[in-house]
Regions:
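Short, low-complexity N-terminal intrinsically disordered segments enriched in polar/charged residues
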Residues: 1-25, 29-49, 57
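Solvent-exposed, non-transmembrane amphipathic alpha-helical segments
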Residues: 39, 51-55, 63, 154, ...
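Low-complexity, intrinsically disordered terminal/linker segments enriched in charged
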Residues: 102-165
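Short, surface-exposed loop/turn motifs at beta-strand boundaries within globular domains
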Residues: 12-14, 24, 89-92, 104, ...
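Surface-exposed, charged secondary-structure patches
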Residues: 2-7, 51-123
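Short, structured coil/loop segments at alpha-helix boundaries
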Residues: 9-10, 36, 63-67, 139
Length: 165
């Protein structure tokens, strides 16, 4: 496997920071806007199963804050992220690495724990870290649950999205 190209200024870095802030602040709308279509569909399906409603009634959740289902749909993901990153107090303590470009439609960033003062760190300083994967769709980089799990496993890193149930 070819090593991914590193890019130090990439839209995924801001997207990852925005997503982590949204998780920390329990901002369901901001979280939803950063998720890929596939991830949104998975969460809508999970919501439909939990709520015992037909899938067509669970689909099409709007991120505008007016959709009453939004909080319930993203709650399992938020709980998983908070648990995987070590609790609500630790979620805001992660930095974001430069982006690694796997291919034209896939990139990831590492979520790095707080090191204190700024410095060059070794792999031993940041492992185990977490990897957050993005797919490029509709002209933006969006977090993808499946790619995050797959790439985290390949890198032998814990999945920051946890086990969403």
């Amino acid at each position: 496997m070819k090593s991914p190209k590193i890019q130090f200024e990439h839209p995924t870095q801001l997207a990852a920071s925005t997503f982590l802030r949204a998780v920390s602040e329990n901002d369901a709308s901001a979280m939803w806007e950063k998720l890929s279509r596939e991830t949104r569909g998975l969460l809508e399906g999970l919501y439909a199963a939990r709520s015992a409603v037909a899938l067509q009634h669970a689909a099409g959740v709007e991120p505008n804050g007016l959709d009453a289902r939004l909080d319930e749909v993203v709650a399992p993901l938020r709980l998983s992220v908070v648990a995987a990153l070590g609790g609500p107090d630790r979620v805001g303590g992660f930095g974001v690495s430069g982006a690694r470009l796997v291919d034209r439609a896939t990139a990831y960033v590492l979520l790095l724990p707080d090191f204190g003062e700024e410095r060059i760190v070794t792999e031993g300083d940041w492992r185990p870290s977490h990897l957050l994967a993005f797919v490029y769709e509709s002209r933006e980089w969006l977090i993808d649950l499946g790619r995050t799990a797959e790439l985290s496993s390949d890198a032998e890193l814990p999945n920051p999205l946890g086990v969403t149930r």
